Amino acid sequence: MEMPLPPDDQELRNVIDKLAQFVARNGPEFEKMTMEKQKDNPKFSFLFGGEFYSYYKCKLALEQQQLICKQQTPELEPAATMPPLPQPPLAPAAPIPPAQGAPSMDELIQQSQWNLQQQEQHLLALRQEQVTAAVAHAVEQQMQKLLEETQLDMNEFDNLLQPIIDTCTKDAISAGKNWMFSNAKSPPHCELMAGHLRNRITADGAHFELRLHLIYLINDVLHHCQRKQARELLAALQKVVVPIYCTSFLAVEEDKQQKIARLLQLWEKNGYFDDSIIQQLQSPALGLGQYQATLINEYSSVVQPVQLAFQQQIQTLKTQHEEFVTSLAQQQQQQQQQQQQLQMPQMEAEVKATPPPPAPPPAPAPAPAIPPTTQPDDSKPPIQMPGSSEYEAPGGVQDPAAAGPRGPGPHDQIPPNKPPWFDQPHPVAPWGQQQPPEQPPYPHHQGGPPHCPPWNNSHEGMWGEQRGDPGWNGQRDAPWNNQPDAAWNSQFEGPWNSQHEQPPWGGGQREPPFRMQRPPHFRGPFPPHQQHPQFNQPPHPHNFNRFPPRFMQDDFPPRHPFERPPYPHRFDYPQGDFPAEMGPPHHHPGHRMPHPGINEHPPWAGPQHPDFGPPPHGFNGQPPHMRRQGPPHINHDDPSLVPNVPYFDLPAGLMAPLVKLEDHEYKPLDPKDIRLPPPMPPSERLLAAVEAFYSPPSHDRPRNSEGWEQNGLYEFFRAKMRARRRKGQEKRNSGPSRSRSRSKSRGRSSSRSNSRSSKSSGSYSRSRSRSCSRSYSRSRSRSRSRSRSSRSRSRSQSRSRSKSYSPGRRRRSRSRSPTPPSSAGLGSNSAPPIPDSRLGEENKGHQMLVKMGWSGSGGLGAKEQGIQDPIKGGDVRDKWDQYKGVGVALDDPYENYRRNKSYSFIARMKARDECK
């Protein structure tokens, strides 16, 4: 392929060369971005099929080829220093794949194909524009020719059309119609007038009133053409009515289209046009397209040269694309030939240097250097295991368990200082089949099972992401030998580290490079690798990483407490049972003693709930029988519960334990008091609440307009109101004169005598001191006789009888002689639980209010601004307060101040009257 000539302008040449280099390095996405940004820049017309497009494509191909060669050259150099591999001498050499980041041949071909398509689309758009411009120019020339033939004054016609456009009166339309009929002397005259109307209506800047009023003029002319039999003018209007009507109809909205459509109905009714024209007018888009095609055929002599020029450009682009593809194929073939020529001497030398394969030894080597091979169908290469020197016991002490007799099989290849379960591949049963349970998993090793059950399949890459770290080589010997290991003890006693780089089963260690084997009861493929949940980060709105409750319950056996949970799947199950074929691990001095009830279900979980997720961040790694059941109090000194990120990065739900139920006013929280939740299983109530939250709305659980449950927080607000009342009651009872005043007086508040006393009628019984005296008298009346109690109550409550408007008293019972639910001692200072005075959901009024949109969580009213408790039946109010509405505060400070001032004023007036 010959190199096209570069542009003479050095600046433009530099732009093309630099862009070719950038596109070769960054890929076709960079070219797309450049085309979008520089689509209006004339300097970048070469990207859209303009001049020097061929030079740009050739330059781009050369840059890509040079980049591939530069990246392949360093790969060929170290190949000579590699150790010889036992390959067949005549095996064909595979082509060297392109370096990472360099586009392959298929990518280059696809990029060229995409460029070709973009160029074709751009050229087609340019062709359409040029064809339209050529047709418009031809039409204008035709109009000029008719104007020269007829010698009509179009300025006079425009002067008559302007009043029609402005006012559209009958006189203006009549004047325009008369001028047209008076000048319709020949077909050229008629064509000139009709063409002038078409140009005025189809112009780009024409507004709707101009088009509509001129169409009204055409309608009037058509009517008179039919009456006067003016066939020449009618034929001229038939040629231009399609673009006039279709353009006006498609350029306006629907309400304005109806005005134009009425004219079409009138034309169809009167029969001004034939059926073909009526069909085009009924489908404006189709009719306009047919009209444009007619113009192209009519002016084909002007259109064909434009179309041929663009067709040649498109064909040139296709030819360049084909040549580019052919050039790439040839270059690839040449590279393969050169590669074969370079590798032939090397392969011959390898064949000569390769010794004959030795006979298979009778016994395997004690420490093989080559990693164990996997099954032939494994798609991944086996993971390189550490050498045997890394697993020697410290101090030269050998594992006494390894000296025992071993059975035949793969265990014979294991050195005596390595546990047999460490890197021994286990046979994997096909999917859908379980391994036979006759053989115990560890028949020849005296130690317990590993902390992580070995999995051996093609999914070991999930656990092999961090094995390149040097930290893997620092593992100690297996903890089930007789040598205590302090580092292993930290795996059970040290809390999990919050950093995601460290696995959750070690204080600072990483997972040993076990051969991972899929669980025997797992029936499906493994999900992608997932990290453990980050509880020190804001949570996702919905955790879809966990399976729903009781998912595949019968397919997973329970696990032993010392086993690591199947971390990639985020499954967790009751951690009490251990499979029957695998006993509990042998005791080791570095381990905790197993609980006596290790084979029993823990008290907080059973086999019915295998949906417990992984323990939260901060779990200290203890087995479940060493943990308490639902710790009622959080140990704030526990370092595993202290978050190590700023408080604003934590989930908002961690603030909930710091807000007490009785708190109702703003109280700033101390970020140092925030603690992570302790490990505890979800309760039945929590699981039921989660299921109810995601359940669809029903009649019992309606939703509001925003999609939330209507009464979802009713119980919470109800409990919060109870706690708030209880706190207020305790504050009132904790005073020096009322320490025992309200303890048992509620039960007797309704059974007092109804006697009155005239002595207290003139006293100010509504003050706060009067309320205190009543409380004091009632508290003392419990330890006296009934008559004295009655006398004390009658003296202190002569006007209020048995009621008080103090905040602690909420509602009077209907019964005349209620009794307290429980009788504590006379010296008891604990207040009895205050019964809830709010109406329950069984109340008809409550149900009616809920149906009308009341949420039920606050006060009455649309904005919940009213009272929250039912109206008290017998509240005694002052004379000026008795007619106030429901929900009006009676302890308004301004009203109280005005009332106190009025007392002094009335007293002065009475004193003045008495002096007179």
UniProtKB/Swiss-Prot annotation:
The CID domain covers 149-289
Modified residue Phosphothreonine is at which positions? T819
Q: Glycyl lysine isopeptide (Lys-Gly) (interchain with G-Cter in SUMO2) crosslink - at what positions?
A: K844, K872
Print the organism lineage. Answer: Eukaryota, Metazoa, Chordata, Craniata, Vertebrata
Low complexity composition-biased segments: 750-766
Query: What GO MF terms are annotated?
Result: RNA binding; transmembrane transporter binding
The record's subcellular locations are:
Cytoplasm; Cytoplasm, Perinuclear region; Endoplasmic reticulum
Whose protein is this, by species? Homo sapiens (Human)
Expression across tissues is: Expressed in brain, placenta, lung, liver, kidney, pancreas, cardiac and skeletal muscle, and in cultured HEL and Dami cells.
Biological process terms in GO annotation = intracellular calcium ion homeostasis; negative regulation of cell population proliferation; nervous system development; positive regulation of calcineurin-NFAT signaling cascade; release of sequestered calcium ion into cytosol; RNA processing
Modification N6-acetyllysine, positions:
K18, K879
Q: Protein name, please?
A: Calcium homeostasis endoplasmic reticulum protein
* A single GO cellular-component term on record: nucleoplasm
Return the Basic residues bias intervals.
739-749, 767-815
Q: Where is this region: Disordered?
A: 336-549, 601-635, 722-878
Task: Enumerate the SMART domains for this protein.
Answer: G_patch, SWAP
- Positions of post-translational Phosphoserine modification: S813, S815, S817, S828, S855, S857, S904
Q: Where are the SURP motif repeats?
A: 15-57
Q: List, alphabetically, the Pfam families matched.
A: CID, DUF7819, G-patch, Surp
